[in-house]
C-alpha cells in the first residue's frame, strides 16, 4: 500500500529514533526502502540490524556517495506501491501520522498528497518523553504547512506568499510524484512540490503529527555563508556558487510556465536573486 523511502548518510545519531517512530505507526501495511549513501559512521550497521529484524525493511548500501538528490530519486524509483512518502533520517512522527493521512487520501481522490502540521525541533529527541504526543495541537495553526487547494495558479501564488515549503515529507500518490525527476540544486524541493500540485490539491491534517529536525547543515544559520554552503555542501562549481538561486529560478519557470511566472513570481525571484548575491558577496569578502 505504502512505500517509505529513507535516504540516509552518516545518520548514526538519529536513524534509530527515525526507524522506531515509523515502526511504531498504527498503520502497518508498508515497506521501508532504506538507502545508505555510503556512510562512513555506524549508519550501515544500524540499518542492517533493523533490516534483519523486520522483513518490511529493504536495505541498500550504495557503493559510493552520490548526491542527495540521487539518493532521494533512488528510493522513489524502487517503489511499486500506490502511495509513497520520503522520511528524513532525523525526523519523528506521531504514531497515527500514516493512518490518518492515508485515510484522507483514500476518500479524497482529487488530492495528490496529505501531511500534518509540523513542529520544528533542534535538540536531541528523547524517545522516552511522550509528552509531545499527548498534546498535538500546534502553537500556531498551519505555522509551517498550509492546505494547498484551488487552481494550479492559485496554489502557486499562495505557496510563494506563504514562503514555507515543509511539504516534502507528505504522503503522495506515487504515480504523480514520479512525473518529476529531482535535480541536484539548492531548494530542489520547491519545483518538486509545484509539479505535484499540477495534478491535484494537498491536504494538511489538523494537529502536529510530524516533528522536523532543524539543526543540520541546511539550517537557516548555515545559509548566512551562502557561497561556502553551495560549494561545500551542494557541490556547486565556483561559478555556479556566485549565482546560487539561478537553478531554482530556471526550474520553477519550467514547472509553472511563463504566464504564471511572469504574472506572480518574476518580481519575487528578481529580489531573491538580488538578496542571494548580497549574501554571496558578504561571504566572500568576510573570509
Protein language model features and the residues they cover:
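Glycine-rich, basic loop-to-helix element that forms the pyrophosphate-binding segment
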Residues: 62-79
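Acidic helix N-cap motif at the loop->helix transition within catalytic regions
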Residues: 16, 41-49, 96
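A conserved acidic beta->alpha catalytic loop
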Residues: 36-45, 64-65, 88
Amino acid at each position: 500500500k505504502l512505500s517509505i523511502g529513507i535516504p540516509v548518510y552518516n545518520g548514526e545519531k538519529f536513524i534509530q529514533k527515525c526507524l522506531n517512530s515509523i515502526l511504531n505507526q498504527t498503520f502497518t501495511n508498508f515497506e521501508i526502502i532504506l538507502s545508505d549513501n555510503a556512510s562512513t559512521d555506524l549508519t550501515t550497521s544500524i540499518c542492517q540490524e533493523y533490516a534483519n529484524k523486520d522483513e518490511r525493511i529493504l536495505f541498500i548500501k550504495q557503493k559510493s556517495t552520490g548526491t542527495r538528490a540521487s539518493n532521494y530519486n533512488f528510493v522513489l524509483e524502487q517503489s511499486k506501491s500506490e502511495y509513497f512518502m520520503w522520511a528524513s533520517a532525523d525526523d519523528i512522527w506521531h504514531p497515527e501520522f500514516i493512518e490518518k493521512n492515508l485515510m484522507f487520501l483514500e476518500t479524497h481522490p482529487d488530492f495528490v498528497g496529505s501531511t500534518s502540521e509540523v513542529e520544528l525541533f533542534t535538540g536531541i529527541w528523547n524517545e522516552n518523553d511522550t509528552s509531545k504526543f499527548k498534546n498535538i495541537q500546534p502553537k500556531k495553526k498551519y505555522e509551517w504547512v498550509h492546505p494547498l487547494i484551488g487552481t494550479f495558479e492559485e496554489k502557486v501564488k499562495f505557496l510563494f506568499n506563504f514562503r514555507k515549503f515543509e511539504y516534502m515529507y507528505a504522503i503522495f500518490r506515487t504515480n504523480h510524484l514520479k512525473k518529476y525527476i529531482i535535480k541536484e540544486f539548492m531548494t530542489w524541493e520547491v519545483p518538486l512540490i509545484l509539479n505535484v500540485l499540477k495534478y491535484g490539491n494537498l491536504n494538511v491534517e489538523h494537529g502536529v503529527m510530524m516533528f522536523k529536525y532543524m539543526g543540520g547543515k541546511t539550517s537557516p544559520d548555515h545559509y548566512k555563508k551562502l557561497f561556502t554552503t553551495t560549494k561545500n555542501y551542494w557541490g556547486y562549481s565556483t561559478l555556479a556558487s556566485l549565482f546560487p538561486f539561478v537553478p531554482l529560478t530556471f526550474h520553477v519557470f519550467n514547472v509553472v510556465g511563463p504566464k504564471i511566472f511572469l504574472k506572480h513570481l518574476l518580481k519575487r525571484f528578481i529580489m531573491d536573486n538580488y538578496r542571494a548575491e548580497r549574501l554571496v558577496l558578504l561571504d566572500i569578502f568576510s573570509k
